[in-house]
């Protein structure tokens, strides 16, 4: 086992953490009984046909876990999170200090136990119980083929169409279908990996060390402790290009020039601004991997190597806020982590706030308020569809046993979370002071997982005068209400600095609502100078006012080819929604084309909702499009689209 050691992060926090008692109903593992110190993966990738037969595609090898028993009374069994797609064939135990090759390796019995539809428990029995504080290594020999954690793409699902591709996606609870682990954000460990690939392929991982070992082997090491969901691997036909002093872009060769052009020189500016605000960037490198088009997310903040959708290659740097969001996770989420998935707002609400602080410094308050207004519109849309009183519209979500945390995903932790952090800044009343507080918060809880109580107690201790005033229980704005009551945020940050960009968009949208639009007034507005988010805001207003009077959408598309023929994904999404809301069948093909070009969940699901909520022709379009694209979508997205096409409760 390549030992990475846990570094100096075992120093207890200055306070006992509430999160030390946190339960995680989404994990079958005994993560409170054992401390995981290090994980090492030694895997070989094979690209064969799908299926269980010989020569089929899969990852095979070993996962070695370095563990320490935490129970005063010792333990005779260890439970890990696993999945039916993992075939474990052997387990051996080596007691004593890590790397002690003199210690005998003994085979140990193991079996699986049912847990939920998204995983199972792997139970390993010790022939002799381990005592309190005993250390040992457990080596598991296994293979994973088809399953939800490892995504295999055929050549036609990639941008280059020449070679297959494989990647892993751990968040929220999918890495148990990649390797046996404590699949909970409550605990963290360092990891290393040795990955063998076929000729002509390159492996990359979320690690701060990347070494080529011989023609087909790659060694990785992550020297800081991270939760299991942030361990990520991708293998494909990959090239790289430097875009800054500590950043490079990775992509298929056909995309590398576009990626280099779009992000050269800008990432360092984002990182440096983040460091000024939130403290040192501890992860060493910040690289970007542009994924194949079927990647279901805008970005996944795997440390050192963010996985991003190729939709971000807009050609005009207009979608850089997604990168700022992922960079912000370097402090909020990756360094300080939610202890379970019911506290997801601690990752995402803070990251939205951090993203918008960086954006304000780099692009100004007007632009940032405009972007935040589009976020607020998404929250409004979500709450209109789900109903404000839906329990998922609380910041603290109660995830019931058996419920996949991924199924609770929505805009609330992002945008309502952002509103709560903004409210706390508003209580402080001084932006510099609140920035200093955020830096102190990161420093206090770095490399740890926390609950809302840990954060809020720290906030009130940091600002004793606010504690004295009882700001946690101001009627209507109680911290408990913020966390545990569903519905619209009690406080909304002031977005009026964005009025200079929003007002013209609102006024222009009004002109399109009349049955005889004043084309002279419309053409006097120079939207050619508008930034992408101003156009997005305008289209959101048009969508809210749809259906428009007959003929207006056709005229709108003809007047603004910049919108109706856009290549920018945010514009294509909204234009598609407007087409469907107005049943503008001449342009239906554009909806299908967009859904065939990418598989991002945030773009895909709203369009299927709009098609199924539209005319008979729109519903037919939904079924035809899904039949044509299902094979190139991520398995989670396929499941969600199927639920939209044929709701279970209908």
From Swiss-Prot:
UniProt-listed Enzyme Commission number(s): 3.4.11.6
Annotated family: Belongs to the peptidase M1 family.
GO molecular-function terms, A-Z: aminopeptidase activity; metallopeptidase activity; zinc ion binding
Positions of post-translational N6-acetyllysine modification: 446
Species the sequence originates in: Mus musculus
Reactions this protein catalyses: Release of N-terminal Arg and Lys from oligopeptides when P1' is not Pro. Also acts on arylamides of Arg and Lys
One Pfam family per UniProt: Peptidase_M1_N
Binding-site residues for substrate, renumbered to this chain: 298-302
Stated role: Exopeptidase which selectively removes arginine and/or lysine residues from the N-terminus of several peptide substrates including Arg(0)-Leu-enkephalin, Arg(0)-Met-enkephalin and Arg(-1)-Lys(0)-somatostatin-14. Can hydrolyze leukotriene A4 (LTA-4) into leukotriene B4 (LTB-4).
Keyword DNA repair carried by entry: no
GO BP, one annotated term: proteolysis
EC category: hydrolase
InterPro entries reported for this sequence: Aminopeptidase_N-like_N (IPR045357), Aminopeptidase_N-like_N_sf (IPR042097), ARM-type_fold (IPR016024), LTA4H_cat (IPR049980), M1_LTA-4_hydro/amino_C_sf (IPR038502), M1_LTA4H (IPR034015), Peptidase_M1 (IPR001930), Peptidase_M1_C (IPR015211)
Subunit structure and binding partners: Monomer.
Keyword Cytoplasm among UniProt keywords: no
Residues that hold Zn(2+) according to the record: 325, 329, 348
Residues at the active site: 326 (proton acceptor)
PANTHER family assigned to the protein according to its UniProt record, in alphabetical order: AMINOPEPTIDASE B, LEUKOTRIENE A-4 HYDROLASE
Compartments reported by the entry: Secreted
Keywords associated with the record: Acetylation, Aminopeptidase, Hydrolase, Metal-binding, Metalloprotease, Protease, Secreted, Zinc
Cofactor detail note: Binds 1 zinc ion per subunit.
Major location (coarse): secreted
GO CC entries: extracellular region; plasma membrane
Protein name: Aminopeptidase B
